[in-house]
Amino acid sequence: MKRFLYILIAYGALGVSTSIAQDIHFSQYYNMPLTTNPAMTGLVNGEFRVQGIYRNQWWNTGSFGKPAFSTPGITFDMPIHFGNSRSGIGIGATLLNDQSGGGLLNDFHGAISLSYLRRLNNDNHQISFGLEPYFWSRNFSDDMQFASDLLGSGQQPVNALNTLVVDVNAGMFYTGTILPKWRIYSGLTLYNLAQSTINIQDLAAMHNLRYSVQIGSEIQLSPQIHLLPSFVFMRQLNVDQLNAGMAIVYQMTDVTSITTGVYVRSNDWIQQLRGDAVIPYIGLDHKRIRAGLSYDYTVSDFQNQPEHAGGLELSLRYVHQVRYLDNLDKLYFCPRF
């Protein structure tokens, strides 16, 4: 298993992988709006929003004594309003740290998000556009005996294996109220627009363009029960992935609700609809705080790996509100994910 992990790390480091896994994304896409679409920056029913997440995979892999893959992340965003006009902007920032092989390979991602928010004429519809310049740094640990573990030569990794990439993402996002108890949203995101070149020693690979489509809805069945169906489709080169599912929100009190849902992740959806994971989710909202927990239960052939376990994600969100912003959702509707 350890050798298998080293090979995965090496392929990712040399840029020869064509998988969507080149870019960081989360099963709880609905709890990480800035990493899903920069046009969602500033869609906050409050003064500002802080969102944190932690993901790990293969956490019982004994070769390293720690999760083989782990990703903590944090985002911040807020709206800025232009007086009583129908327009505004959103600003935000994202920090992600993706570790592979128990810390042998480290990817650090930092981004600044900017969005333009526009409420349309009848107040039931709005559209936003976002831009997200970012940098991505890849570094090897000095503890990794790269050639020794892969080739048996006993050489150590050199600084030339480290790399830095600068690129930009862009997106657009629409939300609308179709009926008094039915809201919808849809978005399109383009990642890695500059398609920067990744240079590692004498090898070069392109950071390939990826696109993502998001569609979802909020359906109010009663004052206490809401349905939240949604999906995200991603494609990069000839690899695609579909995350789809539905959550049910039960409003316990005016300030407390509980959310349960099930999502399915499928790879190569266009060609063969190959199932990868079933992802149950539970969340709790209380006043300004939301906590969420999900687990990726692998259903693909990879579940037969002897030391494999699925992926666990923990999320925590805080939205700051003050008295004079109590009616902010009348200006910019924030979809309920």
Regions found by a protein language model. Give the residues of each.
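Subset of outer-membrane beta-barrel
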Residues: 22-337
